[in-house]
Amino acid sequence: MDNFPDRLLELAIQIQQIPAPTLAEGPRGDFVRGRFIEEGLKEVSMDSLGNVYGCLPGKNKKTSPLIISAHLDTVFPEKTNLAVNKESDKVSAPGIGDNSIGVAALFGILWLLRERGIELTGDVWFVADVCEEGLGDLRGMKAVVDHFGANVLAYLVVEGLALGHIYHRAIGVRRYRVTAHTAGGHSWSDYGQPSAVHEIAALVTQLAAIPLPRTPRTTLNVGVMTGGTSVNTLAAEASFDLDLRSEDLSVLAGLAKTAEELISTAAKPEVHFDVEVIGQRPAGEMSAHHPLVKLAETCLHEQGLDVTFTSGSTDANVPLSRGMPALVLGVTTGGGAHTTHEYIDTAPIEQGMGQLLMFVESCFR
């Protein structure tokens, strides 16, 4: 299949050109569903959340299936300029690496299996899932794992920009939306009364000063702040979104407790805070010595690639947190993830697809 990389890139760009912000992946899901049908996959369906499923039957129905997933959604709003810039060694476009090339790789695996006449022992389920990013809270993958359960060979999660990495540890994440309420007023005549904007700014400063351990790696971030009415108004309402992460669940729980206590003590008679949990990503881990992790390592080495064992917050969090075998492998390298300057390197795609094909074929041996 001499033009395989070009075909894969062409499909990735077709996918990338369909806006798919989290919670609005429908049109992209419809496109993938149509392509699954065109490719002749069996039992093609879309569930109530928008996850798309298609089965490549194996020779033995008694063999547990392999689930290969790639998330449909992107971090970019619907009206984002999705223009593509092609260069000799890379393709730049919002969402091309995270995760359009990952979704395209589902088809790439299928094409390579057929081109090389590889018939697998068990079924392979290709899944394009929703709600991986941000406030999606992994609800798509939670539904996928609920659907298939533990009677699987493994969950293989494909991420476009992760080539060379094996994600076998899932970090825990807690997310909050904190809203301050005050009486508000005029910036001159009511000066001295609390402003909700000032209150959240002071609180964020306190949160950012919480000491965090380097090991286990632990982070705190306020990614969004909103509120206020005008430049000369004491804001009656303002809010911020808080993201807490750690490789260790007990450390995460301690950080969450500290943050919640700071929020509680920031309240005053004239200032009320509402706290809403907007995301909880479960943690889990598969040993670096697990046979599937060792297999993934071998597959990368066969492509002449160095291996980095990695922790992260991905769709693999869900099965790993439930004690099921799962890991993340990548398609290529690149950079600028979650920015409009996102890009993928084109040369490593063949190596990336080579390791994915070897992993899928070897899983059933």
Task: Name each model-derived stretch.
Residues G26, G95-I171, L212-P213, D243, ...:
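Acidic/histidine-rich catalytic neighborhood of metal-dependent amide-processing enzymes
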Residues L106, V158-A183, S187-D190, A196-L203:
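Phosphate/diphosphate-binding glycine-rich loops and adjacent basic-rich segments that engage nucleotide
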Residues V32, A105-L113, M141-V144, I200-V204, ...:
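Buried hydrophobic packing segments
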Residues L72-K86, V152, H168-T179, L327-V328:
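Acidic-glycine-rich active-site phosphate/pyrophosphate-binding loop
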Residues W188, S195-R365:
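Metal-dependent amide/peptide-bond hydrolase catalytic core
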Residues D2-S92:
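Acidic/His- and Gly-rich active-site-bordering loop/insert found
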Residues L82-A93, H181-G184, H301-Q303, G334-H338:
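Glycine/charged-rich beta-loop-alpha catalytic/anionic-binding loops adjacent to active sites
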